[in-house]
Amino acid sequence: MNAFGDGKRFETPPRSQTTIVLRPIGSGLPLGFFSFGIGMLILGCQAIGWIPVDEQHDGGMILMAFVFPLELVATIFAFLARDTLGATTLGLFTTSWLTLGWTQLASPPGQTSVTVGIYLFGFATAVLLLATLSTLGKPFFSVLLSLAASRMILSGLYEVGAAGKVVFEVSGGFALALAALAMYGGAALGLEDARQREVLPLFRRGAAAESFEGFDRQLERLEAEAGVRQQL
């Protein structure tokens, strides 16, 4: 509250002083979903046997040269858009594509690795936690992440030698299902961004649904967001 010598007072509530700066960026989620789907298509076809084992190095190159950089771009833009959960998820998958691609490129065709198996178990744990958090606002993402974690666990069991080739082939089936879901998700998110409303259902709820219900509803939580509050 400010006071002048003439005794007049006027209030300057914090919300009236809020300045909104619009960044010239678009959503990185459609790009992330489409590239994720193509990567899963490669992994699924490798596991089922539709891609010959002796072409493993080609698959690794595609994961590193195509999927990884696109996911990286999607991750950066998700952070710029202040979507912490989405950016964290994309970031974890970004480096996983580089890791898996590099492993395939550096290893003899068909070779398994206990180290890769343990990595997949750890990655699956993180993804399951993210899937649980996603149920609060984005159940479609939760289903996608749960399937991805299941695929990792099955592949991990094969890598450490605790399961046979059949389990690895089943993980390939999961990967193909993930590829289809990711393509649907990418199309839905792209249409949503173009129309500024939900066209294909993504079953948003809570704060995720409120993001399309008006500007005031989004400002209600602005003061507590990272980049506005004093500490992360």
Annotated model-derived regions:
Residues 1-72, 206-232:
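N-terminal topogenic module of multi-pass integral membrane proteins
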Residues 23-38, 80-118:
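Alpha-helical transmembrane segments and their cytosolic membrane-interface
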